[in-house]
Amino acid sequence: MTFDLTNAKERMKGAQEALQRELANIRTGRANPNILNRVEVEYYGAMTPLNQVASISVPEARILLITPFDKSALEAIVHAINVSDLGLNPASDGNIVRLAIPQMTEERRKELAKEVKAEAEKAKVSVRNVRRDIMDDIKKDKDMPEDDARKAEDQTQKLTDENIKAIDEIAAEKEKELLTI
């Protein structure tokens, strides 16, 4: 009898995907529309994600161009960006909003690299929690022969190691992107 690790694989993969979503929101020195994913605009009385009220393009390496679908939302878009924690100053010409992405200081890059490490650690903790849950399930299964239990524990550990390694690679890639000028 083999122990089914499908649920564990899905949950560990979910931790990696959550990490990638979080890291996409951390801005680098280049313009990336993903940094605006968390910005919500008050549009007709409801908080609406920015990408649902405007198109976002990257005409140059350090410029984001935000074109509202409805010109009446322009002021709300500017306000939403100003109150966000992005630290960017939007410039509006009445039709579009330009966002110049400033060059990051070395200090800010290191600060963001620490944030990347913290997010990676959260993902690793999540993976380890899945491992702990599976190990507990294996120990609770009294019908499972000892050899099968040992094999299932080894498979779980191997799966955990693979996911931790993948998380480290994702974080290292983002850190490299941040620290490269």
Curated annotation (Swiss-Prot):
GO biological process, one term: translational termination
A GO molecular-function descriptor: ribosomal large subunit binding
UniProt-listed CDD domains: RRF (cd00520)
Region (Disordered): 135-160
Keyword Protein biosynthesis found: yes
A Pfam cross-reference name: RRF
Subcellular location: Cytoplasm
Record GO cellular component, one term: cytoplasm
Keywords: Cytoplasm, Protein biosynthesis
Keyword Zinc-finger tagged: no
Organism domain of life: Bacteria
Family classification: Belongs to the RRF family.
Functional description taken from the UniProt entry: Responsible for the release of ribosomes from messenger RNA at the termination of protein biosynthesis. May increase the efficiency of translation by recycling ribosomes from one round of translation to another.
HAMAP family: RRF (MF_00040)
The protein, known as: Ribosome-recycling factor
Species per Swiss-Prot/TrEMBL record: Leuconostoc mesenteroides subsp. mesenteroides (strain ATCC 8293 / DSM 20343 / BCRC 11652 / CCM 1803 / JCM 6124 / NCDO 523 / NBRC 100496 / NCIMB 8023 / NCTC 12954 / NRRL B-1118 / 37Y)
